[in-house]
Amino acid sequence: FVDESTDMQEAARAYFDHVVEQYGYEGNLYVTGHSKGGNEAQYVMMTSEHRSEITACYSIEGQGFSDRAIERFKKDNQDYEEILGRMFSINSDMDPVHKLIGVIIPEENTYYVNTHYEDSDGKKNYTYVHDVRGIIRGAEIDWQRDEDGNITHGTEGWLSRLAGILNDNLQKLPEDKKGACAIALMETIDLLQGGSMDDATAFRSDYAVLEIIGIPLITA
């Protein structure tokens, strides 16, 4: 949340580079992942030794990066803007997670798809708003389309918009408080969905910072 990189991001980059170098490839080369996997796919796109060979990155509901990480990406990539042009964000229109931290994927490459968060009995189940099952209808992504059937960028729902507002205010916090609030918010979201953070844990001190400093600023 404030670090330049995480162990999981570095592991993803090392694994990708190893596979490409060990086995090679023919045709197009893609990186993709969901949630933290989407974040790691973006990281690979920015840091891999083979990033110039990657056709595209598809981040599905993946988070963004700290200011320090983004500064590093720009410093290490003279073709930073060109790389961004090959990165795409695909999200449930209700997903709250992809708006967290510093978003780098351009708005013109961001798509919102229809969310299906009803149980078999028809009751709303919000655990699906950040779950690949929530954006799949049958065996395909349920894209938002225009009246002619063409895929559109879509319209984000209220929960996604709220997450964007929260994140914008979160970015106003001092650097040493920003990480604590971000991790507490993300773990709260995951716990509400019945899951857990992939490689991070919020401590009592993080929740204290969120309660004392973060929430008053976010709701101001």
Segments from the language model and where they lie:
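Alpha/beta hydrolase fold serine-hydrolase catalytic domain that processes acyl esters and thioesters
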Residues: 1-28, 48-220
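Gly/Ala-rich beta-loop-alpha elbow adjacent to hydrolase catalytic centers
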Residues: 32-37, 41
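Short glycine-enriched nucleophile-adjacent loop
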Residues: 41-49
